[in-house]
C-alpha cells in the first residue's frame, strides 16, 4: 500500500483545516444563493449573470454538504466502506458535482467576456447578441464531456479499500471509482482508499483542462479587448478610466482570480498523480484534498468581492453583526 505513515497531528491539522473550509463554504455559497434569491423574489426578475451565479452557488453549497456527509459516513458508519455500490455512488456524485461547479464558473467567465468585450468581428458580434444561447450551448456541450467522464470509469482495473483495526484487515477488490486517495480515522480504525490503477486522476485532469482552456481563452481575449479599447481612448484623447475600462478591469480581476485558483488546483492534482507513482507521500494527498475543496470555496468569495450587489450585502451583514456585538457589550455586566 504505502510506506509513509501519517502522524496523528497531521490528521488533526488536516481535519481542522477541512472543517474550517466546509464551514466557510456553507456560509459563502449560502450567502450568494440567498441574496440572489431574495433579490429575485423582490424584483420578480433576475439577470442572466445572477442566474448563472445562483446556480453555481447552489451547486457548490450542495458540494460542501456532500463532503460533510461523506466524512460523517466514513467516520460514523465505517462498515459501509466495504460496500462497492456506496463508494461507486460517492465517486459518481463527486464527478457530477465537480463538473457543474467548474463548467458553471466557466460559463460565467464567458458571459462576462461576451458582455464586456468589444470587437468588430462578425462572429463575435453574432455570439454577443446571442450570449444566453451561447451559455446554454456550453452547458449542453459540457454534458457530453460529463457522459464521457462517467463512461471512462469502466477503465478501472482495481479499486481497493483497506480497513485496519488491530490485526483485522478487510479488502474490497471491486472496480469502483473515487477521486483520489483518502484516509479517515475512527477510533482505532484506519481507512485507506486507493485506486491502484492510477487512471482516475489523469482522465479527470484531462476533462478539467477543457473548461480551464475555455476560461483562459476568454480571459486572454478580454485582455486584448481592453488593450484595443485603451488605444482607442488614447487616440480620441478621452479619460482612461471610463465605464467600459472599469468593467474590463473588474472582469479581468475576477477572471484572473478564478484561473489562478484553478491552476493551483490542477497543480495539486498533478502533484497527487506524481505522489501516487513516485513519491508515495500521503501528506501531499491530504493537501490535494484541501486544495480540491478550497478551490471552489475561495472562488465563491472572489465572486462576492467582485459583485457590487453581493459586496454591498456582505458589508451590510458585517455592519449589522458589528452593531449587535456592540449592543451586547453595552448590555453586559
Swiss-Prot record:
Membrane topology summary = Multi-pass membrane protein
Classification via Gene3D superfamilies: Rhodopsin 7-helix transmembrane proteins
Please share what else the UniProt entry notes about this protein.
Several bitter taste receptors with distinct ligand specificities are expressed in a single taste receptor cell.
Spell out the family assignment given in the record's similarity comment: Belongs to the G-protein coupled receptor T2R family.
| Function per UniProt | Gustducin-coupled receptor implicated in the perception of bitter compounds in the oral cavity and the gastrointestinal tract. Signals through PLCB2 and the calcium-regulated cation channel TRPM5.
A Gene Ontology molecular function term for this protein is: G protein-coupled receptor activity
User: Where found, per UniProt?
Assistant: Membrane
This chain is glycosylated at 186, 195
Q: Which residues lie on this side of the membrane: Cytoplasmic?
A: 35-60, 111-133, 227-255, 305-333
A GO biological-process term: detection of chemical stimulus involved in sensory perception of bitter taste
Record-linked Pfam families: TAS2R
Q: Which residues cross the membrane?
A: 14-34, 61-81, 90-110, 134-154, 206-226, 256-276, 284-304
The record's Gene Ontology cellular component field reads: membrane
Identify this protein by name.
Answer: Taste receptor type 2 member 110
Keyword tags: G-protein coupled receptor, Glycoprotein, Membrane, Receptor, Sensory transduction, Taste, Transducer, Transmembrane, Transmembrane helix
Side Extracellular, residues: 1-13, 82-89, 155-205, 277-283
